Amino acid sequence: MVNPPLSIGGKVGEWVQGIDKTGAPVIYSLTVTRSPFNPRTFVDRSDALSVLIDHEPLEDHSKTRRAILELANAYGFAHDCKYRIVICGSPPRGKGLGSSSIDMASALVGLREERALNVSKTDLYKIMCKVERSDYLFDPQFIVAANPLDGTHTVVTRAPDCSVLAWDTEPEKSVKTEAAMHLDSRRKPYEREYCDIFKMMATGDISLILRAATRSAELNDRLLPKVGFEAARKLVKELGHIGLVSAHTGTWLGFLLPRPIDADALLRISEFFAHCLKREPTRFETGEIC
């Protein structure tokens, strides 16, 4: 019997990415409650362990496989880890959309359900972080501050109800997670500013969250510039009541619009996409979906 698929929601960049007072990385992944990518994961018994991810070369399966084996070793079923895991619909890699974290998280959750394991989301995330710097994706209704190196994390506040109208600034480019680790040290001059940004996030006030996200994107553009950033930033400043979100180690940017969406803001942003970017936006949603 084939089990029904499960889905782990993804993300579009980060609300904020910075460092704490010790210089350790802190990531507030912008997890979404609705995404056009809609990944699905199937977990079924087999004669041996296999991981299949559609449209991806075999080497890109290794992280998910390593996470599975970490779980199996930790919970005593390494001798019986015989499953066929198929992952369909993951976002493109190297873009800041959380594809490898989606793959690992969904495989681990699928095995937890299949084997009825008593393992927390915290422990699953720590396993993911053993494999690589990972996004915390398990509670999309919240904004979570996470250390992607050791897996520690804290729920900061509820995610605001926003629509994200986003685009890939460089479709032909990808950014490897490992290649961007040096950005942690380059953020050190902005440590005090990140502290202020974190405080704004903790208020839960949507206007301050939008300001914090925009400021984090501005700081990040000094470190990893994105095509078209200044034009997008200018529009955000003109409109005043929206935010700008960045994939801090990827290629995507997005406008954050509180719901219900202001009609004038939507018109201006639609014109920006039509005339400046000459493409349609990719739409994501955060917070509660009616």
For each of these PLM feature ranges, what is it?
Residues 246-254:
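Small/polar glycine-rich anion-binding or flexible loop at a beta-alpha turn
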Residues 12-18, 37-42, 136, 142-146, ...:
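Short beta-strand scaffold segments in enzyme catalytic cores
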Residues 119-242, 256-290:
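ATP-dependent small-molecule kinase catalytic core of the GHMP/sugar-kinase superfamily
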Residues 9, 31, 139, 166-170, ...:
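Short beta-strand segments
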Residues 97-121, 137:
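DPxDG-like acidic metal-binding loop motif
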Residues 35-46, 61-68, 81-92, 104-115, ...:
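Long, contiguous secondary-structure blocks with strong helical propensity
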Residues 1-94:
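ATP-binding N-lobe of GHMP and related small-molecule kinases
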